[in-house]
């Protein structure tokens, strides 16, 4: 792990130096954030610094679980509808292509604190902080950034640096802020080196411009935003307030993650060591009159095998007159340990943004039914809403970037578009919903056939036929009489 981390750090230094030389810029530095993000990235990948083979400390990689659960809830039944023109239809096609990647983007955003989503000409790419270099920013708004992209062909390693920035320009007393994109390509024989600069035409990025002309709106005004989207976590950055980067969602709970791994490892080791043992005298295993020479450890092991004894039976050589026999059945502290684990899970979940009791070991999670969930899970609901708001903002930026990209490369007709988002209810319970609609039927608010179609899988025709029959049979008792 140490060697890999060192190599990555070394390559990032080369990447930074090359970018600064070729684009004549000075990269912004956030050493504290870089250290924290690298630490959290290792935890998310399942290689935290507290792993210890000697003391049997392993990891259950709960950081991955909380990031995955957050992404699952945030993107639950997400709908993205873009309407209004032929441009809108094209944008909808681009989003549909990556629909099932959106959950992954949110998970990476939770793990790294920030991810960047950028059009690549054919689809959308996701970049973590390790793959970008921030050049210029104002508060939380990034004004200049360099993206690093790469691919391999045989033993050749190709890298592309893509520099995005707004440039303040004043002509004849009028100040404008055109947007520029510059691309530089490199080839190397080693993955640890960026190599020598080559022409874009010699790479798979041949369709990209080395330097775009100034990009402005048709009326000469500044673009509404950059040609990429930024997904940040909702919580404030208390590590480096000035940095335009978000915190990994578990950054405040690293100590709890460590304690959880230790608690789990101790419990698992105790279970592993809890095997029943029977200590049996050699005289109980060997027939009377057996020569002493036959009572070697190897002979006793062979004898146990012949007798088909369980492997937990261990031979001991008795020295007393009476044969020795003892059973050892270790007592597990599982209940006590699980209580401690649950306390850690509750504290960990709360610090991340979930309600107390959302994560529970060996028990039902708190968000299984809609009954009472509005009151019990308000913290979880608000946290997921915050993540969804950040996701909406990022997707707005991405769709705008796609639209500008379409203008630059003539990919779709010019036209207005409108975006509508729809998210699933994280408190939804199918059984509760079913009972609610059945009560609507019983009170005459909706027809019985509609319930059959919605919940029982009937076609509308069959459902209406069945409902009519039920209405006739139960008319005397008043059931379905109002239909």
Spans of model-derived segments:
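Extended, helix-rich architectural segments
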Residues: 1-154, 483
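Generic structural signal for hydrophobic core residues of well-folded globular domains
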Residues: 14, 66, 70, 74-77, ...
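Extended hydrophobic-aromatic, low-complexity segments
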Residues: 36-37, 43-44, 337, 357-361, ...
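Short glycine/proline-rich turn/loop motifs
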Residues: 74-78, 322-328, 375-378, 473
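C-terminal amphipathic alpha-helical
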Residues: 98-112, 117, 267-275, 333-430, ...
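Extended, regular secondary-structure scaffolds
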Residues: 116-247
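Extended, charged amphipathic alpha-helical segments
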Residues: 209-375, 426
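Activation/maturation switch segments at domain boundaries
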Residues: 437-483
């Amino acid at each position: 792990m140490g060697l890999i981390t060192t190599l990555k750090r070394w390559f990032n230094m080369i990447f930074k130096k090359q970018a600064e030389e070729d684009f004549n810029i000075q990269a912004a530095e956030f050493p504290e954030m870089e250290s924290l993000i690298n630490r959290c990235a290792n935890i998310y990948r399942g290689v935290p610094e507290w792993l210890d083979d000697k003391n049997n400390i392993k990891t259950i990689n709960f950081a991955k679980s909380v990031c995955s659960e957050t992404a699952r809830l945030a993107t639950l039944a997400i709908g993205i509808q873009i309407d209004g023109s032929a441009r809108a239809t094209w944008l909808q096609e681009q989003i549909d292509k990556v629909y099932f990647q959106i959950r992954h983007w949110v998970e990476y955003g939770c793990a790294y604190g920030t991810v960047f989503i950028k059009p690549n000409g054919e689809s959308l790419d996701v970049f973590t902080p390790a793959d970008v270099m921030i050049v210029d920013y104002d508060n939380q708004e990034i004004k200049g950034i360099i993206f690093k992209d790469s691919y391999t062909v045989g033993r050749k390693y190709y890298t592309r640096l893509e520099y995005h920035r707004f440039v303040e320009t004043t002509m004849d007393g009028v100040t404008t802020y055109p947007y520029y994109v510059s691309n530089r390509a490199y080839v190397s024989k080693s993955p640890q080196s960026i190599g020598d600069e080559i022409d874009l035409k010699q790479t798979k990025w041949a369709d990209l411009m080395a330097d775009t002309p100034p990009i402005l709106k048709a009326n000469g005004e500044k673009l509404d935003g950059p040609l990429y989207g930024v997904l940040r976590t909702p919580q404030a950055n208390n590590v480096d307030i000035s940095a335009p980067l978000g915190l990994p969602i578990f950054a405040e709970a690293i100590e709890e993650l460590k304690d959880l791994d230790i608690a789990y490892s101790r419990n698992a080791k105790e279970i592993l060591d809890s095997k029943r043992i029977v200590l049996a005298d050699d005289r109980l295993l060997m027939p009377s009159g057996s020569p002493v020479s036959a009572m070697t450890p190897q002979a006793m092991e062979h004898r146990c095998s012949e007798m088909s004894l369980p492997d937990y039976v261990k031979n001991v050589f008795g020295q007393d007159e009476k044969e020795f026999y003892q059973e050892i059945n270790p007592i597990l502290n599982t209940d006590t340990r699980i209580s401690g684990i649950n306390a850690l899970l509750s504290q960990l979940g709360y610090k991340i943004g979930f309600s107390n009791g959302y994560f529970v070991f060996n028990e039902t999670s708190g968000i299984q039914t809609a009954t009472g969930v509005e009151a019990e899970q308000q913290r979880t609901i608000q946290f997921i809403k915050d993540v969804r708001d950040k996701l909406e903002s990022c997707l707005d930026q991405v769709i705008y970037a796609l639209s500008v990209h379409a203008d630059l490369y003539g990919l779709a007709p010019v036209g207005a578009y409108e975006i509508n988002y729809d998210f699933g209810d994280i408190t939804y319970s199918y059984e509760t919903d079913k009972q609610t609609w059945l009560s609507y039927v019983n009170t005459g608010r909706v027809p019985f056939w509609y319930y059959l179609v919605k919940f029982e899988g009937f076609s509308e025709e069959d459902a209406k036929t069945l409902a009519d029959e039920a209405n006739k049979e139960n008319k005397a008792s008043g059931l379905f009489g109002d239909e």
